[in-house]
Design a protein with these regions (language model features):
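Structural preference for beta-rich elements and adjacent junctions enriched in aromatics
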Residues: 1-139, 149-150, 160
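Transmembrane beta-strands of outer-membrane beta-barrel pores
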Residues: 2-3, 26-28, 37-41, 98-100, ...
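Transmembrane beta-barrel wall of Gram-negative outer-membrane proteins
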Residues: 131-186
Length: 300
């Protein structure tokens, strides 16, 4: 406080916000909620800028509320990025880790909504007003680490419009040495109308501005591997189509396909040379016109 011209101390208004949160467990279900939470410890991240980056920066989730249960939301395509729920007025979630069935549901109202518009090898970002977010995940555990599950997300914007995402994924084992996994994603976008992004750049079919356009996209992952005592062979494919958007996920680039092939020999012995590895891997990334974005060949 400072003194005024009469020598008395100026009285400054006290700003106070009440936060409320809790956690309850019942019959294997965990329920958590937070109202008007104080997440000031993550605000410093918003000021970090990399002038050499043409895409939005990804920050680690450090908020305990969102970290608990995040394994339900794992995805090779980053279909859920909880930092996209930036400044919630409230958030609640319920989840259950059953032996066979597991599920997770989150509902949140965001006061300030970050949005990332992905493009070809770059992205555009801005901060919108309020939005309402829902996330639901279900997983069925089979045996020996095998599982199948699905995920759905939805976000409604105060400015109008909404975005949704649906995914199906699974992991399976065959003959003890073959493993395959997949993830199929469908996205739909009805853009809000806002001037928080202003660029003259466009894609083949749409602008990058938020001008009320509607479109759908898709993404996918497929991997297969064979592992024996000495040999390991893997193939991996991932893609995001030119119209892929995941507003509750983290997507800074679309219009790409990636292939990766790896072959490894593992040497193990009780002799003088106990172990060693020989590996060769080739990675190829292309856009949907067949143009090579990246190509690498690695020998180890």
């Amino acid at each position: 406080r400072q003194k005024n011209s009469e020598g008395n101390m100026n009285e400054e208004p006290i700003n106070s916000d009440i936060s409320l949160g809790g956690e309850y467990e019942l019959n294997g279900n965990t329920f958590e909620f937070t109202i008007n939470p104080d997440f000031s410890q993550v605000e410093a991240d918003q000021s970090k800028i990399n002038i050499n980056s043409t895409t939005a920066l990804r920050f680690e989730e450090r908020r305990i509320f969102f970290n608990e249960g995040k394994d339900f939301l794992s995805s090779d395509l980053s279909t859920v990025y909880t930092r996209s729920i930036n400044n919630p007025d409230y958030a609640m979630k319920v989840y259950n880790r059953g032996e066979k069935h597991s599920y997770y549901f989150l509902d949140a109202e965001d006061a300030q909504t970050p949005i990332i518009v992905p493009g070809y090898q770059r992205s555009y970002s801005g901060l919108l007003g309020k939005s309402h977010a829902n996330i639901f995940s279900y997983n069925y555990n089979i045996e020996k680490g095998q599982n199948i599950g699905f995920l759905a997300t939805n976000r409604d914007f105060e400015e109008g419009g909404n975005s949704s995402l649906f995914s199906l994924k699974g992991n399976f084992l065959f003959n003890e040495i073959y493993n395959t996994r997949f993830e199929l994603v469908s996205t739909a976008m009805d853009e809000p109308i806002s001037d928080v992004i202003n660029t003259t750049n466009v894609s083949k079919e749409h602008t990058y501005n938020l001008d009320g356009e509607s479109f759908e996209g898709y993404g996918g992952v497929f991997g297969i591997s064979r592992d024996t005592e000495n040999w390991s062979t893997r193939y991996y494919f991932a893609t995001k189509s030119p119209n892929y958007r995941s507003d509750l996920g983290f997507t800074t680039e679309n219009n790409w396909k990636k292939h990766s092939v790896e072959h490894k020999y593992k040497y193990r012995s009780d002799g003088f040379v106990r172990k060693g590895n020989v590996e060769i891997r080739k990675d190829l990334m292309q856009d949907y016109d067949g143009v090579i974005i990246d190509l690498s060949l690695i020998h180890i």
